[in-house]
C-alpha cells in the first residue's frame, strides 16, 4: 500500500513538472510572438515616418530647414575647416547651404545620409554636429522603444 502511495506521489510530481514545463514553453513562445508583433508594428510606424520625411525633403519648407540647420551649425563650429555633409539628393542646394552657413566651408555628399539634413564636422575643434533627419528619426525610435509602453513582461 505504501509503495502504491509513493508511486502515485511520484507520478503526480512528474505530471506537475511536465505541466509546468509545458506552460513555461508556451509562455516563452507567446512572448516571442508578441515581441515579433511589437517589432513589426514599430518597423511599420518608423517606415511611414521615414516616407513622410522623404516627402517633406521635396518641399520648400525643407530648404528653409536646411538653411536653419546651416545657420545653427555655424554658431557652434566657429573655426575654419568645417565640412558639411549632405545627402546626394540635396546637391542642388549646396549654394543655399553655404550662404546660410555664412563662412567658408566645404559641402560634400555623404552616402550615410539617406533622408536629409546636415552633418557638420570640424576636425580643428574636434566637434561633430548632427542635424540629419536620419539621426533625428533614429533618436525618436530609441525614445519610442523606451517610452511606448509596448513592454513585454
Please place each PLM-identified region on the residue numbering.
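Charge-rich, N-proximal long alpha-helical rod segments
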Residues: 1-21, 25
